[in-house]
Amino acid sequence: MSSTKLEDSLSRRNWSSASELNETQEPFLNPTDYDDEEFLRYLWREYLHPKEYEWVLIAGYIIVFVVALIGNVLVCVAVWKNHHMRTVTNYFIVNLSLADVLVTITCLPATLVVDITETWFFGQSLCKVIPYLQTVSVSVSVLTLSCIALDRWYAICHPLMFKSTAKRARNSIVVIWIVSCIIMIPQAIVMECSSMLPGLANKTTLFTVCDEHWGGEVYPKMYHICFFLVTYMAPLCLMILAYLQIFRKLWCRQIPGTSSVVQRKWKQQQPVSQPRGSGQQSKARISAVAAEIKQIRARRKTARMLMVVLLVFAICYLPISILNVLKRVFGMFTHTEDRETVYAWFTFSHWLVYANSAANPIIYNFLSGKFREEFKAAFSCCLGVHHRQGDRLARGRTSTESRKSLTTQISNFDNVSKLSEHVVLTSISTLPAANGAGPLQNWYLQQGVPSSLLSTWLEV
């Protein structure tokens, strides 16, 4: 809201179109020379009533509002109802959803009204509150994404340096909101209402502007440069570096601090009987292998989802960030000739900011199996489809049962008991891709493990 002010929209209009009322081609700058009612009808017809392309914008905002509100509420409900989903990362995701809900409810409707009617109808108090809440939401989103990246970086790249806990995550969330509320106070202080038509200021609120009033040229430039660096460029660069290291660790190197992938050598079959308990030890080692591979797959899926969330955030906030800097710092768009294009860019950049709030739940649905199951359960409940309690419990035990089933199948092979007691560490880089073969896969094939079972086991 604060990034695109009403004068940008007003500047796109050609006031000489008032020649319908005035036969001269001079700009219509003195509305008091005409009948007030006639002038207000003219304003409604030419400026306030939505044009054809603006109806498309309205439809886009409605879709974003519904998806963002329902999707982010479902994210919060899913984590609240399921204790197994209350992880450190999911706590931060819930905080991100809360910020999206806040900006969707408080800021999206006001932004749409201003973009269409070019008027601030909400008074002086909300002129300070709504832009302030929007900037707070942006700050919360950026800091939350930064905390997620930092948490994943420590957990995967330096697990022995820092231990993430749910309590620390909750404390971090409180700090995020406090810091965001404090650093955005200047935004609330400088926002004021003013009329673009002083002659009708006492008769109508049309073309009332909610904009920044700094009282100087240096302060807004300094503020918006700092705002761009603190809320976009610097965090984005740091998060990109963090995820690059995470990518190298998960896809190219061994994950330090985790249990290593277990590999065993064949042993010559001895005529003597095996010691008591050796079969159970073999089963335990096989279970360790399954657990390790499952952990790798889970971490890769989580990292992939978070990288997509960061990418979408960077894309959605890039246009408005650039336009803000160009307008507030370099003074562009004040006397531009192509005002329709400028207006289109600002309105589209507004829509992208809110579309980011709607995109996050969609990303969770496609890239997180747990969130997808909870979303399906919620929609099924709303549609009146009732599942047995056992079906719901089965979803919570899916990962455990699949691992047990996998261990049981492998332990049934006769050659499992011939596995050596010797355990060696192997790098995660030896793990095969889904359609490739590596040293670990070749070794299992030599032990007689069927390729069909192995492809399912080692899928990443």
Curated annotation (Swiss-Prot):
The record ties this protein, via InterPro entries, to: GPCR_Rhodpsn, GPCR_Rhodpsn_7TM, Orexin_rcpt, Orexin_rcpt_2
Q: Which organism is it from?
A: Mus musculus (Mouse)
- Positions marked as site (Important for responses to orexin): W44
Recorded protein name is Orexin receptor type 2
Q: What is its main location?
A: membrane
Q: Anything noted about its domains?
A: The N-terminal region is required for orexin signaling.
Tissues showing expression = Widely expressed. Isoform 2 not detected in skeletal muscle and kidney.
Q: Which GO terms describe its biological process?
A: circadian sleep/wake cycle process; feeding behavior; locomotion; neuropeptide signaling pathway; phospholipase C-activating G protein-coupled receptor signaling pathway; regulation of circadian sleep/wake cycle, wakefulness; regulation of cytosolic calcium ion concentration
